[in-house]
Amino acid sequence: MTTTIRPKDRDSVLQSLRAGVVPRAGQHLIQVGRTREIETLVNDIDRIADGGSGFRVVIGEYGAGKTFFLNLVRAVAMERKLVVASADLNPDRRLHASGGQARSLYAELMRNLSTRTKPEGGALAGIVEKFIATAKADAKAQGLATEAIIRERLSHLTELVNGYDFADVIAAYCRGFEEGNEELKANAIRWLRGEYSTKTDARQALGVRSIVDDASIYDQLKLLSRFVRLAGFSGLLVSLDELVNLYKLANTQARNSNYEQILRILNDSLQGSAEGLGFVLGGTPEFLLDPRRGLYSYPALQSRLSQNSFATGELVDFSGPVVRLSSLTPEDFYVLLQKIRGVFALGDESKHLVPDQGIFSFMEHCSKRIGDAYFRTPRTTITSFINLLAILEQNPGTAWQELLGGVEVLADTGGNADLAVDGEDGDEFASFKM
């Protein structure tokens, strides 16, 4: 590796991998394979930036690299001037609910709202201020009031659900901006983040009659996608991971309500009615294929998401909504370990702590311990390799051959939890006894 790597990027990548989590930055330093899949998502991003829409379900076994892939797509989208909202689903965050779980998902998306200049989240206020700053400049040039320009620019949002109130909230933020009223600005951001739980509180604070509730989160995302384009960005990409949590819902009605929301998003995307808005969803094969609990249990989704019957054997088709991630091969994993070695050395080949033969020997050692799992679900294997490099770095003169036999490699069994089903409300026959 000849590219010099900044210590900040090195530490970010290595600390994340050592802890068994996916790095939020620097993914390009350790990316291997998946060229066609990445090209497919980049084409989606370009289409969204051109005012179109996108919808992809990224499917892969536990440990196949879904989260890494989604984070890589997220980074590419921000480089292309898209705003990215990302969140993991869990029992308290869903696409559809009646107990606040959907609003909780929306609030998490807004907390994680990211741009190229603010990649770690919390970008909502900056986006609003960028829109207002542009409006103020135009208002000054035309000799008009800033609020009049804002109202004019947001006028076409009023055709959407909550559009009038959205415009009122942006205007309220502008007043707070001009008057130095921090409380008014904070209240406007609270509304935009979906943090008001009652309409009464929102009306008292901002004079608006609606709030972001469980039923309106998708409509609010459509509003936001148009707004970020008015603020000078290319569009909005919504990245949702851990959709297996919908598969794990025990209550059939709750599951189907969430799948119905996914169908609505998919239909809008296919019909082109969502402007500058894209969705990328990450899940396991069970979440997609299970005929009783997965997306395929919902007939309308099965017909839209089914695989091209001609894509068999080595033939692939990336034009459909589903992108299937295959597991890494031993060759891919070898390249990955080489890249990790390079990151550890800050890109300086003269500082590599193990030679290529050492990587081969490490892979053979892992294969003897846990078989194919060492490259198919490589989380624990990567952690062990980084631990080995850390010992070699901090103990100069130690031979890697002496340490190899003592390297502990365990199979990654975290995927077993994905098949467990929540006992929330119970299925129809959950307690049936003979």
Regions found by a protein language model. Give the residues of each.
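The catalytic "switch" region of P-loop NTPases
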Residues: 4, 8-9, 185-238, 242-354
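C-terminal alpha-helical "lid" subdomain
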Residues: 172-190, 312-316, 326-434
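A short, basic N-terminal segment
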Residues: 1-54, 398-434
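Amphipathic alpha-helical segments in well-structured domains
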Residues: 38, 70, 102-106, 255, ...
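Gly/Ser/Thr-rich loops at beta-strand to alpha-helix junctions
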Residues: 62-67, 244-245, 377
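P-loop NTPase nucleotide-binding core
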Residues: 57-60, 64, 68-231, 393-397, ...
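Conserved phosphate/pyrophosphate-binding and hydrolysis machinery centered on Walker-type P-loop NTPases
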Residues: 31-35, 63, 99, 121, ...
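Eukaryote-specific, cytoplasm-facing alpha-helical/coiled-coil scaffolding segments in long proteins
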Residues: 68, 135-138, 246, 409-417
